[in-house]
Amino acid sequence: MFAVQGNQKFPKGLTKDNIQSLYQQWQVMRNQGATEENNPEFAQISSILRMVQRAHYARMQQMRNQSSEFPDAENTNLRKQQDTLPTTGFNNLPEGKAGMQTLPGRPASNGPTPPNPGNGNVGLNNPSYMNSQASPNIMNAPLQRDTSVPPAPSMVHPHTNTNANSNNLKVYANQLSQQNTSNPTYHNAYDMASMMKNGSRMNNSFPPTTPYPPANDTTVNSSLPHSFASPSSTFEQPHTVQSRAPSVDTTSSSHSFSARNIPANVSMQQQMGRRGSIPVNPSTFSASSPPSGSMLASPYNGYQNDAASFAHSKLPSSANPNTPFNSTATVDVGAAGSHFPYPQPSNLDAINAKTYFQSSSNSPAPYVYRNNLPPSATSFQPSSSRSPSVDPNTVKSAQHIPRMSPSPSASALKTQSHVPSAKVPPTSKLNHAQLAMLKSQIVAYNCLNSPNGQVPPAVQQAIFGRVYGASNEVSPSMPFQQNVPQMSSVKKDTPTRDANMRTSKAPYIQNIPNQFQRRAYSATIPVKNESLAKPSVSPMPLQQSTGKTEVAKRAQFPTNVNYSSCVDPRTYVKTPIPFSKFSSSENLSLIPSLLPPSISWDDVFLSSEIAIACSIANRIDFLEKENRPKSVNKKILQQDKSKSMIELRCLRLLEKQRSLRETINSVIPHSDSLAAGNLRLMFRNVKRQTMQEANLVLALAEKQKTEHAMRQKEKLLTHLRSIMLHRKSIVTKVDKQNKAKTQRCKDIINFHAHLEKEEKKRIERSARQRLQALRADDEAAYLQLLDKAKDTRITHLLKQTDQYLENLTRAVRIQQSNIHSGNTSGKGSNSAELEAPISEEDKNLDYFKVAHRIHEEVEQPKIFVGGTLKDYQLKGLEWMLSLYNNNLNGILADEMGLGKTIQTIAFITYLIEKKNQQGPFLIIVPLSTLTNWIMEFEKWAPSVKKIAYKGPPQLRKTLQSQIRSSNFNVLLTTFEYIIKDRPLLSRIKWVHMIIDEGHRIKNTQSKLTSTLSTYYHSQYRLILTGTPLQNNLPELWALLNFVLPKIFNSIKSFDEWFNTPFANTGGQDKIGLNEEEALLIIKRLHKVLRPFLFRRLKKDVEKELPDKVEKVIKCPLSGLQLKLYQQMKKHGMLFVDGEKGKTGIKGLQNTVMQLKKICNHPFIFEDVERAIDPSGTNVDLLWRAAGKFELLDRILPKLFLTGHKTLMFFQMTQIMTIMEDYLRSKNWKYLRLDGSTKSDDRCSLLAQFNDPKSDVYIFMLSTRAGGLGLNLQTADTVIIFDTDWNPHQDLQAQDRAHRIGQTKEVRILRLITEKSIEENILSRAQYKLDLDGKVIQAGKFDNKSTPEEREAFLRSLLEHDGDDDHDLTYGELQDDELNELISRTDEELVLFKKLDKERAATDIYGKGKPLERLLTVNELPDFYKVEVDSFAVQSSSELEDQYLERKRRRRNSISYTELTLDELNTVDDPSSTLMPRKRGRPRKKTNSGSSLSTPLSQESSLARSGRKNTPSYKQKALRRYCMEIFERLYNLQSEDGRFVNGLFLYPPNRKLYPDYYIIIKRPIALGKIKRNIKNDRYGDVGELIADFMLMFNNAYTYNEEHSIVYEDAKLMEKTLKEVIEDLEKNNSLHAYEEEALNEEQASLVFLENSEAELPLDSGIVSAEDDKVITYEDSSSSYSE
């Protein structure tokens, strides 16, 4: 920091030479780009120069104030400018803005300065002096002229003028010296003139500043001392009483600081604070203050001596780096004193304020309007209030100040108006009385500005005519001491006169010895004595003073006013103040008179300097003591000693440095000249060095330097250009060579690409030719093209398929030769012809012709009297007869509804009539179709003797005698009786075995298949099915294996060759086959199946059959369904309401099945239904709780109204029960058929529904029980409520209505829940249908379709192989879309729309209604909204399992199988009641009760019951034997030491692997096998091995080949075989039995010895009962 007094750099203060050197340094640093933000030294120098500039200006204003008047000849222009200044600068200010304000800190009137009751400093900060109306000023120089003092010279600015100002000051000083040389004005004027003369070279080079004083300059701590060094060489501040208010008259333009624009009555003695800034009181800082970093004057080039030109000149911005002031300085809130109230114009059109005003965001406070202040503040404004704004019209009229009239009148005062006055001519000089009064007022003013703040009584008597006490009261000796006016508590809105009028031209009041002029207070302050209040001047209205309405006359002020005293400032404080009004604006005003005395910053600075000096002295004393040899601390390190010694010596250099600075500063003024003392021309005038020349020299040097650099740069650039040109030539040459190489390479690549393209075209052309040959069944052409192509893969594939077909051909021959021919008279061939060897010509025949070598024309039999067969039915009869003639079996796979039953009856009647084959014929049908078969036989072949083998045991016993006598042609029975009464039925040698719905034997391991294949004998076998391929090729092979066991004897080879093209449609092994390979394999498969499979579609044979249109409708989930679905999906369980109101947890098994239930209807769970509808009376909840039911609520009324009969198929009988409740609530008649419906009732239900007069429009059926063999063609609408995993079940259900005899278009509506498990089920079913389409339908097994038709159909399926959606996916449908979907005609569409409008008008549910149609989440109970943590669910699930097992309600079991024999007996027996069948696999019973007992049945009975009769020692041995095998497999490790039993201990998790339990029907694991061993579940080793093999097969089926589980299973299977061989080799089982027998005999001996000691009630059981005898004691247990 640069200090002025006591500073190390300037020990004797700032001299003109110091200032010149600082300015030169400032100029150099500014040219180098230094700013105050990034250069602290530059900021310090700028602050010092700014401070000196303020001092110059303040001294100049002080000299003007000390002069009496301006000379008339020199200052006429100045007064003219003063008079016209307001109209020039502020004529366009808006109303209410601050105009000319009298600065605080000096009196603004001729009245007395009232003493301050608080701190005696009311003249310093009292705002009453700011707000004075129009009182004449005692400092008014034109009115207080002294003839002894010469007029002051006319000056513009001490820095902007040249020698003119200094000469004027010298003349002025000489005039003063002639009168009185002791006049201080003389010395001041002479010093200022000398300073200006010596500093004239700083005329136009002084650093530019802004015309504002800085609010705070934080870079200069010590700005000005009490005085400068000397009157001659330094700038000295006069030794006057401190004034903490800057004395700048803002009644003139605050932006024009020309000396002639400043009134002569303004005291410009400015006291600078210690920090170099003008003290600012934050409570009185006005919004009109200039931005931080501004300065008072702007002495830069172009400055003119008129306010208008300066106002329109552009001032430097506060952010300009070339200005030597701190642009980032903040308001010095710590400084005491008043502030600079600057007016800020708002109308920028007249003065172009944009050029010099900064943003108002820098202002610390907003503008404060006069009318916003409380009434008490308008007359006496405290220091906390903002400077009042000024009205522009008030400023306009303020240039003509009203005068105080010498003869006041109270009535006249009320009518006076503020009228602008004309120019006032200069008055005469001051007389002696006026001069004495002026001197007294000056003394009083200085006393008030002193620290004491008290005016001596003599001065008060001279000024006021009386003496005031300390409490602001008149002394008792004065006659008017009791007439002190008081503030009134009554607030009024009377406007007050503007307190900022210029008073320089007010008339002087004479001859008032005992009175003083006081300022006029607002009318809101009444006085107690009306006589004393009369002389007060009444304030003028604001609108009159502005001059907006009319020009008023000049105000006449009273000449004789009796002022008593100032108002006690305590009257402005209301006591007490309520707490609610404590923070109001009128109670927050600060009264400066009541504030404590202000702080003297000079004393603070002096104290700070003393403290610093004392600190330095104490530190020196401490360091000296520390470095004394005797007091040295041994613990102090040598490094610390060195530091302390260095510090001590630095502190001792302080005085020497100060002395050196003083010496240097005293020498600097003498070394300023360029001339030297020893030169000859030292006394000649030396040219003064100016900054312009220095700048010019620097510019020339810089120019030369720049030119030299440019020449060097040009030389370097020329050299670089030559290098670059050479480089460019080289690069061009190389690029040309590279382009040539590249072109050659491209030509070669293009040549090879062309060759490759031609070869590819040739290969594609060859492939197309092969495909054409393949599609045309031209095998010779295909083989020839294949030889040319040399495709080894296709060749190998073709060879393999040829070999397979050759083997099949040979197998066909064997099959034909093995079947007993019987009587084949007529056109058929004899057995000798069949046994003839195959010739070379026969080898070249078609595979189909080989199978059907014998052909016979057929006609309708005569005994077939029910009607006439159609052409396609005769074709079917011909194909079945061809199989019979060629000793082959087959599959009649016509689509449902084409009359397979009638064709079969016709075939039987043909054999009876034409072939004389009387049977017996065995027809195995489902129970649901048995009645239909009987009816068809009675209709079409009544002469055929038939037996319906069914009913209770008594009825079947009567039928058995007829069977034994063979008095029948056809036996009709069901699958259950085939198994149940196998001993009887298997004894008969059947001629033909016909199985309806033959897909029941698709599993070769099933009990039905094994029973038929093992025990039943027939010459011919025929399968009737509408869906030969339901899931995969192995199921198709199972059917082929059953009818042709000699041909299709290997499932492995069949699946290996023909399942490859379908592996990429969802299987795990994906082998890439091109179109040709897939087509070749599929064609070979069709070629294999065509002789044995006969299939026609309804659309092919029945051209007049109406179409079947299927639509998939996606239904949304209700709020209840959504919550339950999320719970089940996330936690695998449902949350139900507990008994005590808490949320309970209900665990469920088979997550997929539970999700399907939720999608169908949530009320399938009784707990949920009780929670939602406790009373069970809210019928609307039945359809609002489920999306599917809500959709049906909109569809069914429309269908019933238009007469459309509807079939609705369900998977779950519980949903059918809920649907019954819904239909009953709507009073709609319905029929129901499921697995529990009796056989006799089914016929009556069908007849009732098919009756045209019936009023039943809806028939509910279960898919498995009612989807087979029923004729319901009177219905034209089928609704699939929930999709079956097997799509053919749904197709069977659809064909109940879409069949022969249907005359209407059939609409199939499939309901799918949106975004649920049902979408996955549908996609899986669609995949199965695609597989069926490729294998069966594309084969066109109708013996009449052309190869082109079959090829086109297959190709269309292959093209859409990747499609998942097809044309069946629809989103959620609105009413209009739904109407278009279910309507058949336009009339129905109009009717449906009308019904929708009626429902919307009457329904209480829907959009815009209180409740939605679907149940929302907000309507659910609270416990459904609780989010249960999964950890809590998991921990509590184990505790709830046992309780839920006991409390689980009994539900009706859903049976997808036919009724067993016992159930049928019970059904047929009216005296018995049908008991619900238990879940799980039915227990096997012995045939002991049956009269027909075969050895096989006896063996089975003994084998099953022999486990418990097995001796105990054998069971122990077997248990030990099985456990040893188990331990060997359990402890098996792989080659890397890993136990292979990890994934075989327990079955997979149902939640993680739900599809495992769909694919794997019998899961088993090592844990279950171990439990079976311990519980003696195995009767022999074979059962144990069977369980192990089942576990291995499950692993092979579910997992991919070469996977870890697959390989582990192979290793365990291999180990099992080795263990078995090892144990059998050692005969371990026999050895274990002997050991167990010996142990048992030993125990028996022990028991015989201890038998006498046993008590009678020891629990011995007689051995005669063949029971286990058990003896128990405290130590052991023995069993026999």
Curated annotation (Swiss-Prot):
Q: Which residues form the QLQ domain?
A: 429-465
Tell me which residues make up the Helicase ATP-binding domain. Answer: 881-1046
Which intervals carry biased composition (Low complexity)?
118-127, 222-233, 247-258, 282-299, 374-392, 1488-1502
Residue stretches of biased makeup (Basic and acidic residues): 490-499
Q: Return the SUPFAM superfamilies for the record.
A: Bromodomain, P-loop containing nucleoside triphosphate hydrolases
Against InterPro entries, the record matches this protein to:
Bromodomain, Bromodomain-like_sf, Bromodomain_CS, Gln-Leu-Gln_QLQ, Helicase_ATP-bd, Helicase_C-like, HSA_dom, P-loop_NTPase
What spans are recorded as compositionally biased (Polar residues)? 62-91, 234-245, 406-419, 477-489, 817-832
Show the disulfide pairing. Answer: none
Q: Where in the cell is it found?
A: Nucleus
GO CC, sorted alphabetically, is: chromatin; mitotic spindle; nucleus; SWI/SNF complex
Biased region (Basic residues) positions are 1476-1486
In terms of CDD domains, this protein maps to: Bromo_SNF2, DEXHc_SMARCA2_SMARCA4, SF2_C_SNF
Region annotation (Disordered) ranges? 61-135, 203-258, 274-300, 367-427, 477-499, 817-836, 1466-1511
Give the top-rank taxon of the lineage listed in the UniProt record for this protein. Answer: Eukaryota
Residues holding ATP:
D894, E895, M896, G897, L898, G899, K900, T901
Protein's GO biological process: chromatin remodeling; positive regulation of transcription by RNA polymerase II; regulation of transcription by RNA polymerase II; transcription initiation-coupled chromatin remodeling
Domain Bromo, which positions? 1513-1623
Q: Which PROSITE patterns match?
A: BROMODOMAIN_1, BROMODOMAIN_2, HELICASE_ATP_BIND_1, HELICASE_CTER, HSA, QLQ
Q: What is its main location?
A: nucleus
Q: Residue ranges of the Helicase C-terminal domain? A: 1191-1354
What stretch of residues is annotated with the motif DEGH box?
996-999
What positions does the domain HSA occupy? 704-776
Its family remark reads:
Belongs to the SNF2/RAD54 helicase family.
- Say what the protein does: Helicase. Component of the SWI/SNF complex, an ATP-dependent chromatin remodeling complex, required for the positive and negative regulation of gene expression of a large number of genes. It changes chromatin structure by altering DNA-histone contacts within a nucleosome, leading eventually to a change in nucleosome position, thus facilitating or repressing binding of gene-specific transcription factors.
- Assembly state and interactors? Component of the SWI/SNF global transcription activator complex composed of at least arp9, arp42, snf5, snf22, snf30, sbf59, sol1, ssr1, ssr2, ssr3, ssr4 and tfg3.
Q: What is this protein called?
A: SWI/SNF chromatin-remodeling complex subunit snf22
Q: What lineage does the source organism belong to? A: Eukaryota, Fungi, Dikarya, Ascomycota, Taphrinomycotina
